[in-house]
Amino acid sequence: MAGAAGLTAEVSWKVLERRARTKRSGSVYEPLKSINLPRPDNETLWDKLDHYYRIVKSTLLLYQSPTTGLFPTKTCGGDQKAKIQDSLYCAAGAWALALAYRRIDDDKGRTHELEHSAIKCMRGILYCYMRQADKVQQFKQDPRPTTCLHSVFNVHTGDELLSYEEYGHLQINAVSLYLLYLVEMISSGLQIIYNTDEVSFIQNLVFCVERVYRVPDFGVWERGSKYNNGSTELHSSSVGLAKAALEAINGFNLFGNQGCSWSVIFVDLDAHNRNRQTLCSLLPRESRSHNTDAALLPCISYPAFALDDEVLFSQTLDKVVRKLKGKYGFKRFLRDGYRTSLEDPNRCYYKPAEIKLFDGIECEFPIFFLYMMIDGVFRGNPKQVQEYQDLLTPVLHHTTEGYPVVPKYYYVPADFVEYEKNNPGSQKRFPSNCGRDGKLFLWGQALYIIAKLLADELISPKDIDPVQRYVPLKDQRNVSMRFSNQGPLENDLVVHVALIAESQRLQVFLNTYGIQTQTPQQVEPIQIWPQQELVKAYLQLGINEKLGLSGRPDRPIGCLGTSKIYRILGKTVVCYPIIFDLSDFYMSQDVFLLIDDIKNALQFIKQYWKMHGRPLFLVLIREDNIRGSRFNPILDMLAALKKGIIGGVKVHVDRLQTLISGAVVEQLDFLRISDTEELPEFKSFEELEPPKHSKVKRQSSTPSAPELGQQPDVNISEWKDKPTHEILQKLNDCSCLASQAILLGILLKREGPNFITKEGTVSDHIERVYRRAGSQKLWLAVRYGAAFTQKFSSSIAPHITTFLVHGKQVTLGAFGHEEEVISNPLSPRVIQNIIYYKCNTHDEREAVIQQELVIHIGWIISNNPELFSGMLKIRIGWIIHAMEYELQIRGGDKPALDLYQLSPSEVKQLLLDILQPQQNGRCWLNRRQIDGSLNRTPTGFYDRVWQILERTPNGIIVAGKHLPQQPTLSDMTMYEMNFSLLVEDTLGNIDQPQYRQIVVELLMVVSIVLERNPELEFQDKVDLDRLVKEAFNEFQKDQSRLKEIEKQDDMTSFYNTPPLGKRGTCSYLTKAVMNLLLEGEVKPNNDDPCLIS
């Protein structure tokens, strides 16, 4: 009885409280509850805003934590989770209404309340993040799913929730969205960041976001790949939000109008540009498994506006709308099982093939109607705004007080699933929440406020986008470049070029040819630094000992970064690009490649320079560049620079002191030095002091040195087991640098790097041999030296990422040996370990030649992607095999040239030659060898394999690898990249390029036979090796009968046979396929003309 009385008392108290609130509804702190009453047409501005204020108070701010300021993911049931992304949109909703209230002079304190609700949330997130500063430090050095910031926190305490095993916390989109809204809100006048500790922490968040282009994450939907199996992917939406955040925060002062130089954020422009390139390469796809995704809407439209390519924007948006739009909202992505009736809520991950169950019954999310409304307002498209407002109205619900509720999703109940699958769109869907039970989807509620305020013109796009993330096409000519991703419509940039000679005697020599240069001494007090010194300076950026943050990671500075002028500790500093840096990788010592790199760098700068002021490009000329045959190409390049145009880029060559006035100056004020701080030591580029009375000579004193010095007179296999004293004696006696390098490599493995030789330690001796060989262009010795000292190019990781975002896989490892398949971007250290582990066991030089190939292919695939058409997996070891095979063909009866003796520029040209698709003058054996080594496939090949698999219940076998029909067809779709990669993986066990090409031809034959004979189907596993063997046997029978050639196991003559024609390979393959098909049952067909009774 007492319990019943207590319950009655509680109910009575709630009734009384509700009546009391109704009586004092005029208070500015308690919104009216009569929102469902009709609104008059002649509403005042106050009335309009009061309408939305009541909604915000009751559907958003009511749930904000009074301690942390965060917003819960679930509004009832005592759930303590707060997700960063949801809280950010809630803060944005309150901030948007605060911006509207700024138009009213006497707002009764509402502007202050709403602004500080947003500030409280933003600072609450910052508080949660800063408590995980150790994770930021780890993630900077090693970005992995187990070192990232958490994305879910306790709503009241800010404690981290859920372990890395329980939840996919790696959601870079959430961190990027925080940075973006931080900039937008501070730009509108809010004070969110209070001290330099917080500034240094935000700077470290920027360091984490800069490398998003190579960090696969779990994405907006927290599930990673479409299969929801715990694997991460590179997502366009994450990369796009990161790109937008970096553009917005670059050069931004976190203290707002009251800021100083210490509160400015720095962004690596080259890292940002890699994010831009990655995004443009990935789109219109969301990821490898997601053909499209609704998560792209906030990426390409509000709030990120990450695209500056209108064509790509339209293509991406059209794909999202066409494939995902429904009556109740947008599907997140196809075969999304989230909250469907068939999803098992007790399991975190799906089983293989489970996503097939969700085909056609995916939940629809009304929130994306709101995104489309906002997009329509920004783009000045009232028709789009009205279209989606009309779609939104019938799916909205209302609370008991009449407040609008945006359901999180609409689902198909279990009883109607089969009807919906049989007749898509026929069944009524039901909302996940309607507000009457206290359940609200706060992300949707916040976006509703923003969309309605914009649609009702209570705020303008410029109000909620003060940093101009979106700029209309007509205004792009005069846009401020600092905060926008759009540049001028016409990019007619002139690049400033300063020519710097290594020495005074080189300057005098070039002057005789009319080339005016300056030496490092002549540009003083301006200092010239290599980019490593600038990296050393940036190491001081963001350091905070209290938080345990070390500052900017040791990452190279790219061409955009070295095109600015820097003020460092009172000095004016300019930097030469990394392509002139001899310490990076030996390829810069090849003059022809250096000239190509200079042209490419200038074209790159012209295309992607987005700042006021002109870029400054330093061309560093070394004495070594003009020796012998290298002089004329360098002179031609310098003459082109002097004329003012090179490689299609306009340039202006002048003295450095003159060019500085029009350049961009970056003040590195974070290098402030107090009495207690130690001054960093920086080394500028020093002028070469030649011996007295010496002159620069055009011709090398030993023109035949490359021919004489290349071929070593020692063999590793012979010398590796000889005693150390014999090796040392031979080392002292031989003058061949390649032989010296080989002998030193044996000593390095046996005795270690600190073993003493005649010229010091082994490691120092190898380094000297490497330098000498580079100066003499003895490429065999250079590659030996680079391999033994494990040289690694800083550009390998970005180039591998380029492969991946162009939809390719890459394998590292020697031909005929174990290979490492790279499907996701990796850090430079991991790639270096893979290269030297996989390649050194076969041939020491393989590790460095593979790096050359990666660099060359990265450049080619960016500029001429059509050369890689039909090549899904780039197998570096196999491409090297194809190049060596090509050299054998060219050599004919003579010994083939050694690939390792060619210069890097000759290697690049050889690569371009074999990539050319037209090989009409070649015999079929050679063509199949090259195409097989390149893993080249005909157009539509993977789609045809899918069609074969549909008619092959037991799957396909080749080289012992089985491609099953199930769960392949259930898990994947025909046009999904993962299916194509699975086919490539199946073919990966084939060890002969020409045989692989025959198998590709066989699959095309099987596809055509099945297409023309719909009544036929394979009954058992299709063993492709068996079919090739049968075809070869038939070929041998014909050869024996017609040409009286004895049967043999060697298939060379078969490989050299044209595919088409009376006795082409396809005729034999077709016969083998038909024999296998006719062994099975034939499906009866009443329309068959052969059926006569």
UniProtKB/Swiss-Prot annotation:
Gene Ontology cellular-component terms listed: cytosol; phosphorylase kinase complex; plasma membrane
Region feature (Disordered): 689-716
Pathway annotation from the record: Glycan biosynthesis; glycogen metabolism
Subunit structure: Hexadecamer of 4 heterotetramers, each composed of alpha, beta, gamma, and delta subunits. Alpha (PHKA1 or PHKA2) and beta (PHKB) are regulatory subunits, gamma (PHKG1 or PHKG2) is the catalytic subunit, and delta is calmodulin.
Molecular function terms, GO-annotated: calmodulin binding
Superkingdom per UniProt: Eukaryota
Post-translational modification: Ser-701 is probably phosphorylated by PKA.
Membrane topology: Lipid-anchor
Regulation: By phosphorylation of various serine residues.
Pfam families: Glyco_hydro_15, KPBB_C
Protein name (record): Phosphorylase b kinase regulatory subunit beta
Modified residues (N-acetylalanine): 2
Principal location listed in the UniProt entry: membrane
InterPro entries assigned: 6-hairpin_glycosidase_sf, GH15-like, KPBA/B_C, PHK_A/B_su
Record keywords: Acetylation, Calmodulin-binding, Carbohydrate metabolism, Cell membrane, Disease variant, Glycogen metabolism, Glycogen storage disease, Lipoprotein, Membrane, Phosphoprotein, Prenylation
Protein's organism: Homo sapiens
Lineage: Eukaryota, Metazoa, Chordata, Craniata, Vertebrata
Localization per record: Cell membrane
Its biological purpose: Phosphorylase b kinase catalyzes the phosphorylation of serine in certain substrates, including troponin I. The beta chain acts as a regulatory unit and modulates the activity of the holoenzyme in response to phosphorylation.
Record family assignment: Belongs to the phosphorylase b kinase regulatory chain family.
Annotated spans, Calmodulin-binding: 7-29, 768-795, 920-951
Disease: Glycogen storage disease 9B: A metabolic disorder characterized by hepatomegaly, only slightly elevated transaminases and plasma lipids, clinical improvement with increasing age, and remarkably no clinical muscle involvement. Biochemical observations suggest that this mild phenotype is caused by an incomplete holoenzyme that lacks the beta subunit, but that may possess residual activity.
Residues with the Phosphoserine modification: 12, 27, 701
GO biological process, one term: generation of precursor metabolites and energy
